[in-house]
């Protein structure tokens, strides 16, 4: 299933982004209200997935074995909208997925190396970790991704350095 724990917050206003980003302020004050329990987020995402696929079982043209298989969520893509590393309880959420034997892949914009460190230090790394690299240099990044934090380039380089040492 594809989901995000940070739908209302991102610290960039990428020119190519199709998501509504008018509310993104750079202060991420909206994330202060993101207190949802990680287990509730995971369970709600699974229930949403099951609702989404519920109509396929009645279609005679659909492989019923595939319908049955799709009812067991095996993978979570944490990348739908917003910046997931802004969710303070992300380590707990990733551990919850692991406890349910669900693989996870996380896509980050790289502006929060401190969360990557926390994931590493708390043994909460996702199954796969991706960082969007949208530009080759600071000037182009600023033009394309329109970061809302002043020290964005240092943060990008910090995340890349951290990722280089992860296993």
Residue ranges and their predicted role:
Residues 57-167:
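Conserved AdoMet/S-adenosylmethionine-binding subsite of the radical SAM
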Residues 15-18, 46, 91, 95-98:
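Amphipathic alpha-helical interaction motifs in eukaryotic regulatory proteins
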Residues 17, 21-24, 148:
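Cys/His-rich zinc-coordinating "finger/knuckle" motifs
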Residues 8, 20-22, 134-138:
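Short connector loops/turns at beta-strand edges and beta->alpha or beta->beta junctions
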Residues 1-20, 77-79:
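N-terminal pre-triad scaffold of radical SAM enzymes
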């Amino acid at each position: 299933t594809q989901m995000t724990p940070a739908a209302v917050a991102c610290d960039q206003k990428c020119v190519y982004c199709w998501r509504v980003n008018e509310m993104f302020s750079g202060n991420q004050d909206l994330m202060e209200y993101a207190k949802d329990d990680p287990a509730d987020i995971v369970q709600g995402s699974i229930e949403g997935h099951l609702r989404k696929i519920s109509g396929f079982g009645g279609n005679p043209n659909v492989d019923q074995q595939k319908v049955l298989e799709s009812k067991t969520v095996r993978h979570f893509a944490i990348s739908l909208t917003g910046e997931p590393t802004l969710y303070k309880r992300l380590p707990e959420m990733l551990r919850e997925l692991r406890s349910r034997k669900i693989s996870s892949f996380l896509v980050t914009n790289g502006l929060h190396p401190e969360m990557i460190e926390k994931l590493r230090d708390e043994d909460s790394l996702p199954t796969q970790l991706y960082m969007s690299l949208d530009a080759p240099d600071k000037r182009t990044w600023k033009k394309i991704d329109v970061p809302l934090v002043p020290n964005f380039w240092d943060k990008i380089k910090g995340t890349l350095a951290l990722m280089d040492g992860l296993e």
